[in-house]
Regions:
Chain B
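Short, well-ordered coil/turn segments that N-cap beta-strands
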Residues: 38-40, 59-63, 90-92, 123-127, ...
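Active-site mouth loops of central-metabolism enzymes
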Residues: 8-24, 64-79, 101-107, 128-141, ...
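Glycine-rich phosphate-binding active-site loops on the catalytic face of alpha/beta enzymes
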Residues: 65-70, 88-103, 150-165, 187-229
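N-terminal capping/small domains of soluble enzymes
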Residues: 1-64
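Flavin-dependent oxidoreductase catalytic cores
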Residues: 214, 218-276
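Catalytic cores of alpha/beta
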Residues: 53, 74-85, 136-147, 170, ...
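Glycine-rich, proline-tolerant flexible connector loops at the mouths of alpha/beta enzymes
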Residues: 31-51, 67-74, 94-112, 158-167
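Conserved anion-binding
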Residues: 83, 93-154
Length: 589, 276
C-alpha cells in the first residue's frame, strides 16, 4: 500500500488492550490521512462529544501518506476534542516525529483510557509497548526526550508533554524533536489527563512510493520551485517567519497591547531582521525540508528555538515588550514546560488589560519583561496567578467579569494579525473550526502578500468564497500531510500530482477539493453536536465596534455579518451554519 | 468569467531570469521548469543563451535573449552585435531595449535606425522592443510603438523590470491600440499573480514576461474554485500608473505628467479615501 505503512494501532491505556484498526482504501481516498483521517477516526469511538478529560476521549496521533517521504514532511497531527475550546481540534507539528512513526511501521495511534500511573508508549517494528514513566513525570520536555532516548534509542524521535501537560493547563502543547510543538488547542493537556508522558518512535522502514521515476522528477521540480519562490526560497530561509513583523506593522495591523492598537513603535526591535542580527545562531529545518524556516537562537545565558513570528508578537507587541532576549527566553521556557506561546501571550495580554481596568488586582503591567518568565513558569505549574492564567483568556476574562477583553474565538486566542486590517482574515478567524487560528485560511496571503491573488484587504466582497477555498486546501495539505509553507510555492494541481506519484491513486483537482470540503464539513458537524453554531462564529466586540486610531488600518472595523451570510451560502450551510442535507449528500457524509 | 485554459496560458509565458546575480544553477532550474510546464520560451541574459539553448534542445521551448539590457543606452552597433551573437548561440527571439533618452529627445530617426540595426542583425529571430513605459508619457509610448514597427520589430514590450515600474493594463491597452492585431504586445515587469496576468491579457497582451510563472499557472487552477475573488471589482487606482508615479525613479517631467493625470481623474474623489 504505497504511501501508508498499513497499520493504525488503537490502544486503551487503562486496560492495556490494543488492536489494529482497519481503514479501507475508500476511507483513505475520502479523508487522506493526518487531520482528515484523524477526525474521521475520532468520530468512531467518540460520536457524541464527551469531556476532553474523560478517559474515553480519544487522542489520535496521525501521519499522512506523504509523511516520511522527501516531500518536506516529517509532520504529524494530534487530533482530539480540545479542552480549551470544546471543539474538535487538530494540532500539527514538524520536526521528524511523523517520519519516525512511519519508520516504526505505524501510520497512526488512537489512544483511549487513562493509565493508572504515568506511562509512555514506545513504537518500534510495528509494535506498541506501554512503558512505565513514573521517573519521567515532572521532567521538562527536553529532559523527557533525552531520558526516553536513553531507554529506547538515541535515534528515537519523542513527542512528549512537560509540566504544563501534566497539570492539564488548558493550552498545554505536545513537544517533539526538542522544540517542535503541536501547540494549539491543549492537546498536551489531553495527553496529561491520560497519564501519558510521551510517545517514542524509531525504525527504518521506508515509505513505499508507487511511481519512483515520477516521484524523482517531481521532487527535483519541487525543489526548484521552492528555491525560486521569493517566500520559500528567500524570506523564510534568511529571516524566518518573523520576517512578517515589519510587514504587518507597516499595514497597521500588528496587534499591540491586547489588540488596542495596530502599530507597535518598537516592532523593528522584535523583527526577523533584528533576530538575525542579534540572537540567531543558525537556521534549522524539519525532516527533509529545503526551506529551513526554524531559528536556533542564543541569549547570553540560554539557547533554544525561536522566536517565530507569532511568539515574537505574543510576548512582544501584544504585551508592549520590546526586549528580544526576554521574548526569546519566554519562548524557550514555553518549549521546555510545554505551553502554546500564542495562547500564553494572548492570556497575558488579557491579564494586563484586566489589571489596567481594575477588574483584576494582580500586578500585570504593559512592557514588564522582567516578570515574563515567572508568569510562564507559574502557569505551567498552576501556582499563584498561574492558576488563573492556565485557564486561557476566555475563562480568565469571564472569571473577572470582563469577557469582552479576551481576544479569542471559540475560546482560542487570536494570533498576530488584527482582523480590522484584513476583512478576509476576520472571516477566517470567526469561522475556524478550532477557534482563533490563522492557519485554517491564511488570508494574509491574498490580502497582504498578494498570493495567489491580490485582494483589497478592507473590502468584504468576494472574501467568503476564498476563505472557504483556503480552508479546504488547508484541510487537504494538513491531511496529506505537508508543510503549509508549500502553499506559497505550489497549488492544488501539484498536490494532486504529489499524491498520485506517492500513493498510485489518482485525484483530480476537483476531487481533492471535495476531500478538503468533506473534512471541513465533518469537523463542523462535530462542533454542531458539541453545541456550537452561528453565535460562536463571532469575534470579540472590540473588532466590530472599536476603530483602530493609528496606522494604515485606522478607522477600520470588521463587517462580519454580511460575510458570514455569504460564507454559509458558499458552504451550503443554512443561516444558522448547519450543513444542509443536500450538502452532506454531495460530500457523502 | 475568465475564458482561458492552462495550455493557452503556458504558451503565452516567457519564463524569465534576468538578475545580475543569477548563476548557471538558476538558469538550469529556469530551463527545467520551462520544459516541465511547457512555457513558450525562457528569457535570459546574453551570457546564458548558449547554455539555455543546449539545455532546452528538443524540448520545444524557445530561448529569448536580451540586448542593450536594461538601459538601452548603448550604441546601435553594440546592441546589434549582442543580438547577432545571441542568435548564433541559439536565441530565437531578441528583447531589445529602446533608446529611451533618444525617444524622449524626439530623435525619431535615430530610434528607428537603432531598432532596425538590431532587427537586421537578428536575422530570422523575432525582435521585441522594450519601451520602458515607466519613463514615458502616453504620447511617447505611442511614438515608441510606431517607431518599433517601422524599425522592423514584431513585438513591443512594456518594461525591463528594472525601471520605474512594471506593466500596467493602461499601457498595454495603449500599445495594443497603436500597433494593431498583427504585432505582438508583451507585458513584463512586476507581474506577481494570476489576476495581474489576466488583467494584462484582457488589455491586449499576447505574451507575458514572468518570473512568477509557476505561481501564476497554479493561480489559474485555484481561480476555477473561487472565481468571485478573482473577478472582484477593481479599485482603479490600484492598477493605475499615475498612482505609482515616483519622483525618485522617474524623470521629473514624467512624474509631473502622471501626477497631473491623477489629479484630473474622475476616480480620484471616490477612491482617495483608501489613501487617507
Amino acid at each position: 500500500m504505497s504511501g501508508w505503512m498499513g497499520k493504525i494501532v488503537a490502544i486503551d491505556l487503562g486496560s492495556r488492550e490494543r488492536r489494529t484498526v482497519a481503514v479501507s482504501e475508500e476511507t483513505r481516498r475520502r479523508f487522506l490521512g493526518g487531520r482528515g483521517l484523524g477526525v474521521r477516526l475520532y468520530n468512531d469511538p467518540c460520536p457524541d462529544p464527551i469531556d476532553p478529560f474523560d478517559p474515553d476521549n480519544a487522542l489520535i496521533f496521525m501521519t499522512g501518506p506523504l509523511t516520511g517521504t522527501t516531500m518536506t514532511s516529517g509532520r504529524y497531527q494530534v487530533v482530539s476534542r480540545s479542552p480549551l475550546t470544546g471543539t474538535i481540534c487538530d494540532s500539527s507539528s514538524g520536526g521528524t516525529f511523523g517520519a519516525a512513526l512511519k519508520g516504526a511501521g505505524v501510520d497512526g495511534l488512537i489512544v483511549r483510557g487513562r493509565a493508572e500511573r504515568p506511562v509512555y508508549l514506545a513504537v518500534q517494528d510495528g509494535e506498541v509497548e506501554v512503558r512505565d514513566a513514573a521517573a519521567l513525570w515532572g521532567l521538562d520536555t527536553q529532559k523527557t526526550q533525552k531520558a526516553v532516548q536513553a531507554e529506547i534509542s538515541s535515534k528515537a524521535s519523542v513527542a512528549c508533554i512537560g509540566p504544563a501537560g501534566e497539570n492539564r493547563v488548558l493550552f498545554a502543547a505536545v513537544m517533539n524533536d526538542k522544540d517542535r510543538a503541536a501547540g494549539r488547542g491543549g492537546m498536551g493537556a489531553v495527553m496529561g489527563g491520560k497519564n501519558l508522558k510521551a510517545v517514542a518512535a524509531s525504525g527504518n522502514r521506508a515509505v513505499a512510493i508507487a511511481d519512483p521515476a515520477g516521484y524523482k522528477d517531481l521532487t527535483a521540480r519541487l525543489d526548484r520551485i521552492v528555491d525560486k519562490n521569493p517566500v520559500t526560497g528567500k524570506s523564510l530561509q534568511v529571516l524566518g517567519t518573523s520576517v512578517l513583523v515589519n510587514i504587518i506593522n507597516a499595514h497597521g495591523m500588528f496587534p499591540t497591547e491586547n489588540f488596542r492598537r495596530g502599530v507597535f513603535n518598537d516592532a523593528e526591535g522584535t523583527s526577523g531582521e533584528k533576530i538575525a542580527e542579534t540572537l540567531l545562531e543558525r537556521q534549522s529545518a524539519c525532516y527533509k525540508c529545503p526551506i529551513g524556516c526554524g531559528r536556533t537562537t542564543r541569549t547570553r545565558t540560554k539557547r533554544g528555538e525561536g522566536p517565530e513570528y507569532e511568539t515574537a508578537w505574543a510576548f512582544g507587541a501584544n504585551l508592549g515588550i520590546s526586549d528580544l532576549t526576554a521574548i526569546a527566553e519566554a519562548n524557550y521556557a514555553c518549549n521546555e514546560l510545554g505551553l502554546d506561546t500564542i495562547t500564553m501571550g494572548g492570556t497575558l495580554g488579557c491579564a494586563m488589560e484586566l489589571r489596567e481596568t481594575g477588574a483584576w488586582k494582580e500586578n500585570f503591567r504593559w512592557g514588564e519583561a522582567g516578570r515574563l518568565l515567572d508568569w510562564v513558569t507559574d502557569t505551567a505549574y498552576r501556582r499563584g496567578v498561574g492558576a488563573d492564567l492556565a485557564l486561557g483568556s476566555k475563562r480568565l476574562a469571564v472569571k473577572h467579569g470582563r469577557p469582552e477583553l479576551a481576544m479569542q474565538v471559540k475560546g482560542m486566542e487570536i494570533p498576530a494579525y488584527d482582523p480590522r486590517g484584513a476583512q478576509g482574515m476576520a472571516l477566517s478567524y470567526a469561522t475556524s473550526n478550532r477557534g482563533g487560528c490563522h492557519m485554517r485560511a491564511y488570508m494574509i496571503a491574498p490580502e497582504i502578500l498578494g498570493h495567489p491573488v491580490f485582494l483589497d484587504r478592507f473590502s468584504t466582497a468576494g472574501k467568503a468564497e476564498l476563505v472557504a477555498l483556503f480552508q479546504d486546501v488547508s484541510a487537504v495539505v494538513d491531511s496529506a500531510v505537508l508543510c503549509r509553507f508549500l502553499q506559497f510555492a505550489v497549488g492544488i494541481s501539484t498536490f494532486a500530482e504529489i499524491l498520485r506519484t506517492v500513493t498510485g491513486l489518482d485525484w483530480s483537482e476537483e476531487e481533492l477539493m471535495r476531500v478538503g470540503r468533506r473534512i471541513y464539513t465533518l469537523e463542523r458537524l462535530f462542533n454542531i453536536r458539541a453545541g456550537f453554531g452561528r453565535a460562536d462564529d463571532a469575534l470579540p466586540p472590540r473588532f466590530l465596534n472599536e476603530e483602530l486610531q493609528t496606522g494604515s488600518s485606522r478607522r477600520r472595523r470588521v463587517g462580519l455579518e454580511p460575510m458570514l451570510d455569504d460564507y454559509y451560502a458558499v458552504r451550503g450551510w443554512d443561516r444558522n451554519g448547519v450543513p444542509r442535507p443536500q450538502t452532506l449528500a454531495e460530500l457523502g457524509l | 468569467m475568465i475564458d482561458l485554459d492552462r495550455e493557452t496560458l503556458v504558451k503565452m509565458i516567457d519564463h524569465t531570469e534576468l538578475s545580475a546575480h543569477s548563476g548557471e544553477k538558476k538558469i538550469a532550474n529556469l530551463c527545467d521548469e520551462a520544459r516541465s510546464f511547457g512555457f513558450y520560451a525562457v528569457c535570459v541574459n546574453g551570457a546564458h543563451t548558449a547554455y539555455a539553448a543546449g539545455r532546452l534542445a528538443g524540448s520545444g521551448v524557445l530561448v529569448c535573449a536580451v540586448a542593450g539590457f536594461p538601459l538601452g543606452a548603448g550604441t546601435s552597433s553594440a546592441k546589434a552585435f549582442e543580438a547577432a551573437e545571441a542568435v548564433r548561440n541559439g536565441a530565437s527571439e531578441i528583447d531589445m531595449v529602446i533608446n529611451v533618452g533618444a525617444l524622449r529627445d524626439k530623435k525619431f530617426d535615430f530610434v528607428r535606425d537603432d531598432i532596425r540595426a538590431v532587427a537586421e542583425a537578428s536575422g530570422p529571430a523575432l525582435v521585441k522592443v522594450i519601451l520602458e513605459t515607466g519613463y514615458l508619457t502616453d504620447e511617447e509610448i505611442v511614438g515608441g510603438c510606431k517607431l518599433s514597427v517601422e524599425g522592423g520589430a514584431q513585438f513591443v514590450k512594456t518594461s525591463t523590470g528594472f525601471g520605474a515600474f512594471g506593466a500596467f493594463p493602461e499601457h498595454v491597452r495603449l500599445m495594443r491600440q497603436t500597433v494593431g492585431p498583427a504585432i505582438g504586445v508583451k507585458a513584463a515587469g512586476g507581474i506577481k499573480n494570476f489576476k495581474e496576468a489576466w488583467r494584462l491579457i484582457l488589455a491586449g497582451a499576447s505574451r507575458l514576461g514572468l518570473s512568477a510563472s509557476v505561481g501564476i499557472v497554479e493561480g489559474l487552477s485555484l481561480y476555477k474554485f473561487a472565481p468571485a475573488a478573482w473577478l472582484e471589482e477593481e479599485i482603479p487606482c490600484h492598477i493605475c500608473p499615475s498612482r505609482f508615479a515616483n519622483l525618485d525613479k522617474q524623470p521629473k517631467a514624467v512624474y509631473a505628467y502622471y501626477k497631473k493625470k491623477c489629479l484630473a481623474c474622475p476616480h480620484l474623489e471616490k477612491y482617495n479615501k483608501y489613501y487617507e
